[in-house]
Design a protein with these regions (language model features):
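N-terminal strand-loop-strand
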Residues: 1-37
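Active-site segment of metal-dependent pyrophosphate-handling enzymes
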Residues: 2, 7-11, 24, 50-54, ...
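Conserved Nudix-box catalytic region and its N-terminal flanking loop in Nudix hydrolases
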Residues: 22-62, 140-153, 158, 162
Length: 185
């Protein structure tokens, strides 16, 4: 028995959006597979992490646009003999032009419940992602633009902050929220 255990390294990419006041994550179903998964790629010997992230993202995004995205580390964990590294992919203009290709059967946005029902994320892992999102937005309130559409009403923006659990007394009254937004910008 070999005392040195080797691990593979898998990089998962999370495309996240707030759709109908709920945080959702993009999942894919590859052809010939009967399960959903996150866009991912396996780390090869001479790979750099950014290249692996781009390779995972290229499953659903055209290669031409990959340079316009940022990748932020959420967490990592060991699952049997596989180390999973999780990144959120960000785009300032919130534009994702997803492509269907011959490797994919379907793509979809899953809420917390659907992610748990399909055994994609445990509640603990989903909470880590939500916590990351909250902290990312709290670090700079303008970061909310990474998760919502470019066109939104003041009420939608206000609800988004509240639904993310970013509690600030100014968020609950529209007049105060408007003043707070003006000060932030």
């Amino acid at each position: 028995m070999n005392p040195l255990k080797t691990f593979g390294v898998k990089v998962n990419i999370y495309f996240m959006r707030i759709i109908h006041d709920e945080l959702k994550i993009l999942v894919i179903q590859k052809k010939g597979k009967d399960y959903w998964e996150f866009p991912n790629a396996i780390f090869k010997e001479d790979d750099e992490i950014l290249e692996v992230c781009k390779r995972a993202a290229s499953q659903v995004i055209n290669h031409i646009h990959l340079g316009n995205f940022e990748y932020k580390l959420i967490n990592n964990f060991i699952n049997d003999s596989l180390i999973e590294v999780n990144y959120v992919i960000l785009h300032k203009k919130f534009k994702f032009n997803f492509i269907y290709n011959d490797l994919l059967n379907d793509i979809n946005w899953f809420s917390t419940k659907k992610l748990k029902d399909n055994f994609l994320l445990s509640q603990v892992k989903f909470n880590e992602i939500v916590d990351f999102t909250k902290q990312f937005v709290k670090s700079n309130y303008a970061n909310i633009r990474y998760f919502i559409s470019g066109k939104y009403t003041l009420s939608e923006l206000q609800k988004t902050y509240i639904n993310l659990g970013i509690n600030n007394k100014q968020f609950y009254e529209k007049r105060n929220f408007r003043k707070w937004l003006f000060i932030q910008n």
